[in-house]
Amino acid sequence: MPRGQKSKLRAREKRHQARCENQDLGATQAPVAEGESSSSANLLFGDRPQNLPAAETLSIPEALQGAPSTTNTIAPVSCTSSNEGASNQDEKSLGSSREAEGWQEDPLSKKVVSLVHFLLQKYEKKEPITKGDMIKFVIRKDKGHFNEILKRASEHIELAFGVDLKEVDPIRHYYAFFSKLDLTYDETTSDEEKIPKTGLLMIALGVIFMNGNRAPEEAVWEIMNVMGVYADRKHFLYGDPRKVMTKDLVQLKYLEYQQVPDSDPPRYEFLWGPRAHAETSKMKVLEFVAKMHDTVPSAFPSCYEEALRDEEQRAQARVAARAHTAAMANARSRTTSSSFSHAK
């Protein structure tokens, strides 16, 4: 793998180590990803939550992505945060230097990067994932830190692809990937497509929600471009990204793609489709977005409040549905009893 590509995944590991060792520093400005300007990072973030770095770098390995990757982050445009304030330049410099020192002193970071690639290669080859193989081929003498290394590697994969790595056999220590959201999209795709396209869908849903529940097409592609996914370029895994976004996911009713009313020349926008509303929730998507920003959902106050309202409405709908089901069951029971009595 090219050195520049590996450095992008390591950048996040630097920040992880720096945060662990420098909790007293508060918010510091994370270095912008290699090959990326500060202005482009700010453009992608828009109004970001309080005390968050302007860029959180996550690399999708080139062997699986087929295109350079920089910042894999959703732009919260409508979800403004309260009391936003940027760290001063001295804090930025101090934070960056501490991060660099932390990276040099943290040998586990290299293991994390290697394990990410190992796990994704296992997925690509459809080979079983076992604890024994992870220790034998990657972790080796650092097996005492297995849990920490696996946790950090799993977080990278979760943010890149929207999946969790879970132990499915605690006796033989077998692991498998599972979709992070309750999406049945996995069931409609081949094993080869399952993980990457689910991640693409999750990010699209996040962009839409964070842009006021309807995202201009250009805003969605801006984020996708940063991931190395372009509307007019064939992608190693996604194939034709424009077709995936504007046709495949639309036909599956996960997304809606429509012309902006009264736009001249015509402009288009994305919305959540009915299947997305049915199979996931705003809170789950917000939790995913918050994790990408290394924060909590409440760091986006307006979106958090909207997600809470959505959760309450869903809970009320479930209660009403159960009550309706119970009433129907009682009615059928009474009808059956009445018919039986008349028969006698």
From Swiss-Prot:
Residues 67-88, 335-344 have a biased composition (Polar residues). It is found in: Cytoplasm. May enhance ubiquitin ligase activity of RING-type zinc finger-containing E3 ubiquitin-protein ligases. Proposed to act through recruitment and/or stabilization of the Ubl-conjugating enzyme (E2) at the E3:substrate complex. It comes from Macaca fascicularis (Crab-eating macaque). PROSITE patterns: MAGE (PS50838). Its main location: cytoplasm. This is Melanoma-associated antigen B18. Keywords: Cytoplasm, Tumor antigen, Ubl conjugation pathway. InterPro entries: MAGE, MAGE_N, MAGE_WH1, MAGE_WH2, MHD_dom. The lineage of its organism: Eukaryota, Metazoa, Chordata, Craniata, Vertebrata. Interacts with LNX1. PANTHER family: MELANOMA-ASSOCIATED ANTIGEN B18, MELANOMA-ASSOCIATED ANTIGEN MAGE ANTIGEN. Residues 324-334 have a biased composition (Low complexity). Residues 1-17 have a biased composition (Basic residues).
